[in-house]
Amino acid sequence: MHRFYHPEQISSPCKIILTEEASNHLARVLRLKVQEPVSIFNGDEYDYHGIIQSIDKRKVTINIETKTLNICNPKIHISLLQSVTSKEKIDMIFQKSTELGISSLQLIDSERSNFRIPDHKIDSRLEHLRKVVISACEQSGRSRIPTINNRIISFSDIEKSSENVLKFILDPQAHQSLGKVEFNKIENIMNILLLIGPEGGFTNSEIIIANKLGFQSINLGKRVLRTETASLAMLSAMHMLFGDFV
């Protein structure tokens, strides 16, 4: 069943009018017809099921009949602090991490970031990324949309979080690998924070600051991974240990 995002509150039963963008996709790209079933989500915990009532040039009306609790939302809250990199890589990281079950996404400027987003383009860039994650939610079946901070923070803006948050910073030179972490001694982990550097990695001073904020330095083996590979590998590993892959 095809899924569509609707940015407004939904009750069940009710009638809704899809956005112009969603209406165009339904009618002109997918070429769905009146009376075909569809599923709608709006960012809450539910999927709303209905049928297409009418299709006009720029407006599609859906008759919502029932709702069900979404079973694809992530079980644990994983936040990704991702150093700014190229547009294509950031798009892929946000898309794939949404599919894998990320809950929160934050872009950070680090000393070795070789890409910068001009101030006058930040709002449009973040709006584009929000569309990327919504599309990934449509594809993957989840209904909760990952939060995206409305600004890009500097490394010094990273705040110390509560003690019950498991925090990792990836460092190829770290003495401890992910496989050596004594996870059997960690209980009731529901919040995880991942700090991923740019192509050139974090500087020593940044790693020291992160360690003081409670981040454990770890590596992912002998091979040096690209920033987009490292982000998705860590997210997958966390879900294997604590989340949706268990």
PLM features: residue spans?
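N-terminal positively charged helical leader segments and presequences
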Residues: 1-70, 122
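Short, ordered loop/turn segments at secondary-structure junctions
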Residues: 9, 67, 110-112, 222
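Glycine/charged-rich beta-loop-alpha catalytic/anionic-binding loops adjacent to active sites
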Residues: 16-18, 75-79, 190-193, 212-220
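Mobile, glycine- and charge-enriched loop segments
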Residues: 38, 63, 69-81, 183, ...
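RNA substrate-binding interface of SAM-dependent RNA methyltransferases
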Residues: 71-168
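Active-site/ligand-binding-proximal alpha/beta "capping" segment
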Residues: 162-208, 215-218
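Structured adenosyl-cofactor binding patch, chiefly the S-adenosyl-L-methionine
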Residues: 204-246
